[in-house]
Amino acid sequence: QCDWSSDVCSSDLQKAADDLAKELAQYLWDQRDRLRPKVMEIDEAVRRVKAVLADPARKPLLFADCADNPGGGGRGNTIHVLKAFLENGIDRTAYGIFNDPQLAAEAHRLGIGSRFTAQLNRDETNKLSGKLTAPAQVMGLSDGEFVGRRGTMGGRKGSLGQTAWLRLDGRIDVVFITNRQQCLDTEMIEHIGIKVRDMRCVVVKSRGHFRAGFNDIFADEQILEVDSPGLTTPVLQRLPWTNLRHPIWPLEENMTWQVPAEVAVR
């Protein structure tokens, strides 16, 4: 099921309860366009970053890779935004946190300063995650232990597991972790040596909880949600639905609906 419902409880005023339930249902339907997610395509995100990189007077940007939010069940390792940034020459960017235990372990074996060809998601089988290969340098290593700075992690200990900071293609700094979780706090990136305030762009794998951890650096107008293929995309049309009754909004944009004459009584 994928429905709204309006439920009204009454001890003895059945008609009043029925009428109010219908009124609420109609209100919900009339407000449906307000609930459309406001996310941008990857191409637009690339354009915005290029503008920031070209003009020092522009404020830095923070992108939420909300379609791959581990807090909502995402795998924390889709490559789509990262790949687009690499292909378009984006630099001065921090990307965190990317769940790839195998790559983090490889970086620890090689050691700080080592250069190698990083194979992202080498053992991943989920098609949404994707694979990516890029030249990399090991910039930092840690055991992933940190103390949050503010927001939901403020003053709390966290553990990312074996963690590695890799500079991909000499331009983008990515934090690879072992314990999958969403990026909630700047310390998840900074504990290993990256300085968020020095970056012109930051990308986090989170949907909303990150805001309280980054809002002293990025104002609301500097925070943008970007959409891509992923398990937690808010754009429902992207998902491969099965066994879903039709028509249903928003998959059928032009569908019509009317409040039923009769309402269920329980």
PLM features per residue range, with description:
Residues 49-54, 70-82, 107-112:
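Short glycine/threonine-rich loop-to-helix capping motif typified by GTGT followed
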Residues 1-8:
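Single conserved hydrophobic/aromatic residue that forms the stacking wall/gate
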Residues 99-148, 222-230:
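Acidic, Ser/Thr-rich peripheral helices and adjacent loops at domain boundaries
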Residues 29, 146-266:
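Extended hydrophobic packing segments that form well-structured cores
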